[in-house]
Structure formats: C-alpha cells, structure tokens
UniProtKB/Swiss-Prot annotation:
This is Ribonuclease HII. GO terms for molecular function: manganese ion binding; RNA binding; RNA-DNA hybrid ribonuclease activity. Belongs to the RNase HII family. SUPFAM superfamilies: Ribonuclease H-like (SSF53098). Residues 1-26 are annotated as: Disordered.
Length: 259
C-alpha cells in the first residue's frame, strides 16, 4: 500500500493528481509507435487515434455503482504514450497490491482527474444520473481538454467532445484501464476510512457492497448517513426502524399507565 494516501475527491469539483516528473502533455510526441503493447490489452483504437493526430485522448471509468453505501467515484486519465505503465488491465482483475502500485505509477506519469458523487446526490438524482455527472466532471477537470474520450460501458456522459463508448473497455483500452484503477483505489481508500469512522458496518472489508455481513450490520445498526437510502435494501431497513420506533412511541402511554 502506498505510504501517502491520495487527497479524497470532493463532490464539488475534481481532484487532480499531477505528474511528479516528465514533460508536459502538449510537448510530448503523439506518435502511435510510442504506445507500448501490453499483455492482455489491445491498443488498436488508441493507435488509430494517435496516428490521426487527434490528441490528447483520455479514458474514463467509474467505481461503485452497485454498493449500498459510499460514493460512486469517476476518474479520467490522459496517458503519456511514451510512459504507459506495464500491466494495465481491468482493475477488477488485479490484486489489491498490484492496483496500488499501478495507481502510484499512473499518478506519477499521467494527467488524472477524480470526482465523486456522494450518496446524497445518488439518492436525489438516481445512480445512473449521478454516475454520468461524475464521469463528465472528471473529464472536464483534466488539465487538458481531450479531443476524444474512451468511456467504459454504453451510457454516454454529457460531454461536448467526441466520446466513444466501449463495452468492457477497462479490459481493452489502456486509458480506460488506468481510469478504472484510479477510481477503484480512490474509492477503496475512502471506504477504509469510513470503516474506521463508522465502526460496526465493516465498510473496510466489503467496501459498501451488499454482502451478508453488511446486511446483518444494517439490521443491527440501521443505516448511517453514508448509506444510499434510495437503494431497496437500505430503504427496507429504514422502514423497519421507523415501524419499530412508532410501536415504541405507541407503547409508552401503556407503560406509563402500568407504572
């Protein structure tokens, strides 16, 4: 694990992870031959974009659509074609140790922007709209405006630049893979922090997903302010707690009469 955790993203604006070394992206060579071929990933589309002179090109992805608690985190990355970290892949296919190492390397060599949509926005807008908002603002927060953005999935975020949706893109496109790693590591670290701040839920283990442990904690403790109350399992526990409280209130006069 990295010795220094990243600054956590704000719901109000992007967080940048500036490269610690190397020349600016505007000055780097855009040659397609500068792109490395890494095992497990295809760079045909990125090569074509770079060869056409359509640069910079970015990748965007999110982490945390499905959990019952915590934010959805979106990341956008512009990779340096000459310094692509070796071994990039879908973050879900990597070990935690490998993700952490790649996170450090990506932040040191690429332009990175991260935005989170907190549970309050998810509950207000719905998870789809909150995710699209986070993805769009992560891209807008990059130091350079990309000419083209590769985005994982098939749901296009509202962006003025050209967007290419790629289903399974985090296992196909290097910049999407990098974004998926940044988003997941950032979110996992945040959930570990929430686990310490809200003991008993086990956030540091299940990262907010609907595991058996999490379900038991919800039944025992009820939801906290980091739960997504618009999600059915959380809403159901809220209803149970409300009904229990109402029964207790109704029973109070009877208890007083018996005392």
């Amino acid at each position: 694990m990295l010795s220094t955790p990243p600054k956590l993203p704000s719901a109000h604006g992007p967080v940048h992870f500036p490269r610690r070394s190397g020349t600016g992206m505007n000055r780097m060579a855009r040659s397609a031959t500068a792109v490395k071929t890494l095992a497990g990933l295809s760079f045909k589309r990125e090569r074509a974009v770079l060869k056409s002179g359509m640069a910079p090109v970015a990748g965007a992805d999110e982490a945390g659509r499905g959990p019952l608690a915590g934010p959805v985190v979106a990341a956008a990355v512009i990779l340096d074609p000459k310094r692509i970290p070796a071994g990039l892949d879908d973050s879900k296919k990597l070990t935690a140790t490998r993700r952490e190492a790649l996170f450090d390397e990506i932040c040191a060599t690429a332009e990175v922007s991260v935005v989170m949509a907190p549970p309050s926005r998810i509950d207000r807008d719905n998870i789809r709209q909150a995710t699209l908002w986070a993805l769009a603002n992560a891209v807008k927060g990059l130091p350079e405006d990309p000419r083209l953005v590769f985005v994982d999935g098939n749901d296009r975020p509202p962006l003025e630049c050209e967007v290419e949706m790629v289903i399974g893109g985090d296992g196909l496109i290097a910049s999407i893979a990098a974004a998926s790693i940044v988003a997941k590591v950032t979110r996992d670290r945040l959930m570990v922090g929430l686990g310490a701040a809200f003991p008993g839920y086990g956030f540091e283990r299940h990262m907010g997903y609907g595991t058996a442990e999490h379900g038991a904690a919800l039944r025992r403790l009820g939801p906290c302010r980091h739960h997504r109350t618009s999600f059915a399992p959380v809403r159901a526990q809220q209803l149970v707690l409300f009904e229990t409280e109402m029964l207790e209130i109704e029973a109070e006069p009877l208890v007083d009469a018996l005392v």
